[in-house]
């Protein structure tokens, strides 16, 4: 099950390989994932983090985790393993994935480790290494870590242990970064009302604060952190967002938004309660942002629709397509200095903030969009 639900191939030597042919693959499309205490054991976490420590070599690593029941105990193993390899760790605590990523970059860390299984069922957990630029490490660097892991070529010859301390700067650093990219006064002038389906996930920590700091009234549902995601599950889908649509209609809200388990993706609905697909919301934002920033680049996956082509043509911009996977989009955005990246599943990336999927940043951009133009007009 490690590596996004691929079966673990176990022989007499633990974790010889993963996949149908035991090819020695750990990373899936987004980090390393497995079922906690089955294939994603604490022993496995220790060995994986030793491999990540060997890859990072030195410096201080920022560690964060989502609200899953196993996340906090895994964070203790992560930090102690980093320390045993001579690397210091700062613990950000329970934060959304994009918060950890932005803080890693902005606060000058050598790297980050996010403990999350994103939208996977509650019994899963995972580890996502983040580079010093605030973006998930490249496929090439994933291969380096896998080689270290399977060869057990760990750097354990350290004369000094590292240490762990708490760092409470990440959340406000993240919120300040988002606010710096939008017209706060414009948003505040509209006195917007927003329905938030927090999905019992990590955006509970930041999304309400963000809306309040942008002068918005909020209606929150599924707002208690719950590692079992008892409200509607960790993955927002058209089949489990009826409560969000009803909250928008019943409270005369201007916008509704639902987040996945770790808060890097967002699904929106308009002020009539109609849900927007990930592609549709990405097109609305792209059209808005490219009109403000013509001659820009947009990166998206090969499985996204072709509607973006007309928008980029009208704004003298270009679209670049990549393999499926947020890492592919993020890394291509960096190399091309792209303004926008998106996936059809609700993952939207705004390059001026960070080249990663970010449910909070996407929400703020949507609030600015509807502050300038009625979303119903945009949808027409």
Predicted features along the sequence, with ranges:
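An N-terminal, well-structured beta->alpha segment
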Residues: 23-85, 111, 164-192
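Gly/Ser/Thr-enriched, mixed-charge loops and adjacent short helices
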Residues: 35, 125-251
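N-terminal small/polar loop signature for handling phosphorylated ligands or for N-terminal nucleophile
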Residues: 50, 61-125, 210-269
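Glycine-rich phosphate-binding loop
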Residues: 110-124, 248-270, 274-275, 319-357
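Phosphate-binding and adjacent anionic-ligand microenvironments
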Residues: 293-380
